[in-house]
Amino acid sequence: MPRKMYSCDFETTTKVEDCRVWAYGYMNIEDHSEYKIGNSLDEFMAWVLKVQADLYFHNLKFDGAFIINWLERNGFKWSADGLPNTYNTIISRMGQWYMIDICLGYKGKRKIHTVIYDSLKKLPFPVKKIAKDFKLTVLKGDIDYHKERPVGYEITPDEYAYIKNDIQIIAEALLIQFKQGLDRMTAGSDDLKGFKDIITTKKFKKVFPTLSLGLDKEVRYAYRGGFTWLNDRFKEKEIGEGMVFDVNSLYPAQMYSRLLPYGEPIVFEGKYVWDEDYPLHIQHIRCEFELKEGYIPTIQIKRSRFYKGNEYLKSSGGEIADLWVSNVDLELMKEHYDLYNVEYISGLKFKATTGLFKDFIDKWTHIKTTSEGAIKQLAKLMLNSLYGKFASNPDVTGKVPYLKENGALGFRLGEEETKDPVYTPMGVFITAWARYTTITAAQACFDRIIYCDTDSIHLTGTEIPDVIKDIVDPKKLGYWAHESTFKRAKYLRQKTYIQDIYMKEVDGKLVEGSPDDYTTIKFSVKCAGMTDKIKKEVTFENFKVGFSRKMKPKPVQVPGGVVLVDDTFTIK
């Protein structure tokens, strides 16, 4: 008999000295008529211990803290061995919560347990956005989170409806995923399973062999994220009119058409020599460098005492830089920099082909373009989650929760644990080609480029640049979509900028406009780590380094669970 599945949620008090659950709700994911809303954590946990089901909380990192507090105070201890009256967790080294597995015992060989998962790992969006984008039958409401609610507080009809809507939104969205066969713990795992189903597990193992941890470590040195860079010419200055273009599905586009690695790599010493059977390579290189005049910097060095990890460098500053780079990145380096005292140490070369992901991307692109609501959003998720799974870190050493002397949860690092890597070379080259796409387009617009962020270029002026004018389309895979045109803007640093965007009304909806047809201006604030509440305080006048507000909720572990306390957010 299959296990039942439930969507669950807590509502909690907001005072450090009185941290507790004042309301809970659960709903059967497959039968929405089976649900309950109550006001006692003890009552909820009594149900958890007997239900033997799979439960989903949206942001387990928050709600899970209350559950583990309760378990620790009621005789349960953490154990990885599946002993009766223990619980196990999957909490990453970085503090990401994935699972709580509560073991009650065994009936014969059958484990009697309830497992609690994080639906945020399968649906990485706020509940409000899920309800809207999936076009579900209910929408997220609102309540006064700071209202006084003493122990035994009676839930009002409005609060009851709010809680029911929250659990129903996640229940409906998860059910749609499960009906599509997307039943793994995370969106990335769903993607990888779906890809294996298309090419077969047998072929997957042949095409993407498991590399040794030592070899994977060397490959991983060349793995980097998206290209995010602000042109110093425009930093902290108010800018006039400009345009923003985004690549449609940047990473899937590289997976669809670019030359990508497969198979066992061959280690080589010194400098790579062209090999038509192994046309891709990762090169270990030492050098000094100086940025050429009129070129965008592309070298970023992390984990070094000489350089800032998030800064793209104009010079090696007289130091010898030690780099592992894909041949795609190396090509850009040589074009953008003068390299000195170059020493080619060693490297890895790979067989390569195109089209490995064609059937997978064709399938989900077709679903995306022919569907609406939930299925369309799922297709977007499936298209964008797979590439990262290939570069999953094999070091899965996690954190273990415990109760500190003050009664709050603490976390210690668990025993070292590793798993087989998937195939990191694929992640290296997909992301390298993505950076290449963005950087080459930005470089071709050097006189106009303000800012790049992974899949986007922000330009001065309102003319489509020649480099992309023939590949502008709102939907085509890998084409550049015209995201917006702004009247004025101000950029302070990476992921920190504001814009006045031209908008117009079409069929009762506001859409992006132009200087010629706009009917209104939309003020847009993009700032990593800034809450919506703080964004309402931002103006062109006060948006500068040093802007500060004590309005950012910060989760703090306290006896009983977690409380969000107001912390200071400052633009540095």
UniProtKB/Swiss-Prot annotation:
Cofactor(s) listed: Mg(2+)
Residue numbers marked as site, Essential for 3'-5' exonucleolysis: D9, E11, F62, S119, L120
The protein, known as: DNA polymerase
Summary of the function given for this chain in its UniProt record: Polymerase responsible for protein-primed viral DNA replication by strand displacement with high processivity and fidelity.
More details: This DNA polymerase requires a protein as a primer.
InterPro entries associated with the record: DNA-dir_DNA_pol_B (IPR006172), DNA-dir_DNA_pol_B_CS (IPR017964), DNA-dir_DNA_pol_B_mt/vir (IPR004868), DNA-dir_DNA_polB_phi29_vir (IPR014416), DNA/RNA_pol_sf (IPR043502), DNA_pol_palm_dom_sf (IPR023211), RNaseH-like_sf (IPR012337), RNaseH_sf (IPR036397)
A biological process from GO: viral DNA genome replication
Residues annotated to bind Mg(2+) 1: D142, D166
Catalytic function, reaction form: DNA(n) + a 2'-deoxyribonucleoside 5'-triphosphate = DNA(n+1) + diphosphate
